Amino acid sequence: MNSNNREEQKVSAAKFYGVGVGPGDPKLITLRAVEVLQEIEVIAIPKSKMERESIAWEIAKTHCPSGVRIMELEMPMTSDESILRAAWQSAADKIQDEMQKGNSVAFLTLGDPSLYSTYSYLLTILEPVLSPEQIETIPGITAMAAAAARVNWPLATGDEPLVILPGIEGLEEYEKYPNLVLMKVSRNLPEVLKRTQTTGAQAILATRVGQAGENIRVLDAQEELEKVDYLSLVLLKQK
């Protein structure tokens, strides 16, 4: 086999992994995720300028070989879609460059890669240029599942629906459903409290699930909280 054929085989064998590392507790990472991390050449870590350390990397690093290469990918904290698209494209280009060299890349994500993750946007860019065999999405335990488990809270039972909202927009429309999960509630907690007072719903506030500073507790509709940590969610169950 000549050197060109060997190089082509190396490139075609390179894989792109979306690795869900769970909510924060290193014990809640899956065996498949550990297998991949132990063999990977490049770890891709999404970070905003505001972040000093990546929580996902803190979870994953104990499972990675000492010589693994870290590729930090800047993801701006903005709602400007043109800026976000440029950042996603830049990240996808860097990942593809590594794969062209024959290196497999693992993109880390808190929780599960398929739920409100930057990985999904990179996937839409890379799927058309990679073969199906070169992509593997490794599921992870979500913060909402871990929070519910911590307090023995059934997310849904029987034929009940479960509604997941990325914020509180349109909350009134969904209050007819028995089970709700509200993500990204940090700045909207006063409105959530107001709605629980109106509807009498049971609520659990979960902050930094599985991480240092974890706080999971029943939310008292009468208390006054203006803002909580960015990594917070609310589980709601209508009475």
Where are these regions (language model features)?
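Class I SAM-dependent methyltransferase SAM-binding "motif I" and its flanking Rossmann-like core
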Residues: 115-176, 225
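A contiguous loop/helix-start segment that scaffolds small-molecule binding in enzyme catalytic cores
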Residues: 16, 174-239
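Conserved Motif II region of HX4D acyltransferases
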Residues: 98-120
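Glycine-rich, flexible N-terminal cofactor/catalytic loop recognition
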Residues: 6-75, 194, 204, 212-213, ...
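General beta-strand structural signal in soluble alpha/beta enzymes
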Residues: 45, 72, 107-109, 135-140, ...
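A polyampholytic, Gly/Pro-enriched intrinsically disordered region
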Residues: 90-98, 154-166, 223-233
